[in-house]
Curated annotation (Swiss-Prot):
InterPro entries per record: PyrdxlP-dep_transferase_arc, PyrdxlP-dep_Trfase, PyrdxlP-dep_Trfase_major, SelA-like, UPF0425_MJ0158-like_C
Similarity comment: family membership: Belongs to the UPF0425 family.
Name used for this protein in its record: UPF0425 pyridoxal phosphate-dependent protein MJ0158
Residues with PTM N6-(pyridoxal phosphate)lysine: 208
SUPFAM superfamilies: PLP-dependent transferases
Keyword Methyltransferase among UniProt keywords: no
Signal peptide residues on this chain, from the entry's feature table: none
Cofactor: pyridoxal 5'-phosphate
One Pfam family, short name: SelA
UniProt entry keywords in alphabetical sequence: Pyridoxal phosphate
Subunit structure: Homodimer.
GO molecular function annotations of the record: L-seryl-tRNA(Sec) selenium transferase activity
């Protein structure tokens, strides 16, 4: 694990390199393959409505309308904007003040914002990717959090999803689904929206696998959403008009077809050169071990070295090689503190459409070689 200060230095370094490339070569020399490339699709007529109170009134109504459609809500539900998904998670835990939070996800670890929020209200926190462990710990004093898709886009099994929700409902526990990427990627597996599965609350990120600004969209039962939103306003966690405008336009323009195309491209992406490189490097150092897997919209390199500390340092070094030499932006180097250090390549962005598979795989292979042969 990196310290907070080391995380800060990593982020500062990444931003400096991005700015240098932008100034020297222009925007076309950068390829955001993080899966969080986002966008800001507002219309010209939206600009006149960005005033604090006019914008809040107009765009909040639009976000509610299109957000409920996106997240599967009905007339008993409400949808509001926050300035990040993490902000919505914090506001939820501050408002509900649960005695304990039980978190089920497809693969450990969970997003750090959840445990950090629990510490603020002194809630006991437990996370597991074993459904049996989760079911045994749920009671009426529990806030049950379910992650639909991990930071590395591993998708929850639908039957386990339903089991946790049904058990929570039977024990009168509130169910909150962290569907940051899952609200969209789960659609590729024909999974229903979280609210249609019986969740009380769901949050999604408006920059993940869609062309919105970095923001959080919270939807669910009106009385719960109102309570959480009010708590969020006390700390300035709610989305302001410019952000709401970007979220509204992203929702209105959302098209699953781009994600479907990335899904098909990912299935056919040739990863054999990574396997070949792994064998070559292991002959030099038996501690080198490139662990990779396909994701629904690309692939992820989860490990390159057996020792955990060295592994994280090497993944970051590889990420910086990708950025400096090939203009490829990943969460590994540009992500917020606490984000996964796995090297994830996501093919859903417009930038991904500008480069072919050969460019990406060459960049990956050469960047790994550089990290281990320097």
């Amino acid at each position: 694990m990196l310290s907070d200060y080391e995380e800060f230095l990593r982020l500062e370094k990444a931003r400096k390199i991005i700015l240098e490339i932008l100034n020297e070569k222009g925007r076309d020399a950068l390829y955001d393959l993080s899966g969080l490339s986002g966008g800001f699709l507002i219309d010209e007529k939206d600009k006149a409505l960005l005033n604090t109170y006019i914008g809040s009134s107009y765009f909040a109504e639009k976000v509610n309308e299109y957000g409920l459609k996106h997240l599967g809500g009905d007339e008993n539900d409400k949808c509001v904007g926050f300035n990040r998904t993490s902000s919505a998670i914090l506001a939820t835990i501050l408002a509900l003040k649960p005695k304990k939070v039980i978190h089920y996800l497809p693969e450990l670890p969970g997003h750090p914002s959840i445990e950090r929020s629990c510490k603020i209200v002194n809630a006991k926190y437990f996370e597991s990717d074993k459904v049996g462990e989760i079911l045994n710990k749920i009671d009426k004093d529990t806030l049950v959090i379910i992650t639909g898709s991990t930071m590395d886009l591993k998708v929850i099994e639908l039957e386990n999803f339903k089991k946790v929700i049904n058990t929570a409902k039977n024990k009168e526990a509130i169910v909150f689904v962290d569907d940051a990427s899952g609200a969209r990627v789960r659609l590729l597996f024909n999974q229903p929206p979280a609210l249609k599965l019986g969740a009380d609350l769901v949050v999604t990120s408006t920059d993940k696998l869609m062309e919105g600004p970095r923001g959080g969209l919270l939807a669910g039962k009106k009385e719960l959403v109102d309570k959480i939103y009010i708590e969020g306003t006390k700390f300035g966690l709610e989305a302001q008009p410019p952000l709401l405008a970007g979220i509204y336009r992203a929702l209105k323009n959302f098209n699953l077809e781009r994600i479907r195309k990335a899904f098909e491209r990912a299935k056919n992406f040739d990863l054999s050169k990574i396997e070949k490189l792994n064998k070559e490097l292991k002959a030099i150092d038996d501690n080198i071990n490139i662990v990779y897997e396909r994701t629904p919209t690309g692939f992820v390199i989860k490990r390159v070295y057996k020792d955990d500390t060295i592994n994280i340092k090497k993944l970051i070094e590889i990420g910086f090689n990708l950025l400096k030499n090939y203009g490829i932006i990943t969460i590994t180097v540009a992500g917020m503190p606490g984000a996964s250090k796995s090297l994830r390549i996501d093919l859903t962005s417009r930038d991904a459409e500008r480069i072919d598979d050969n460019y990406i795989i060459k960049a990956i292979v050469e960047s790994i070689k550089m990290a281990f042969k320097s």
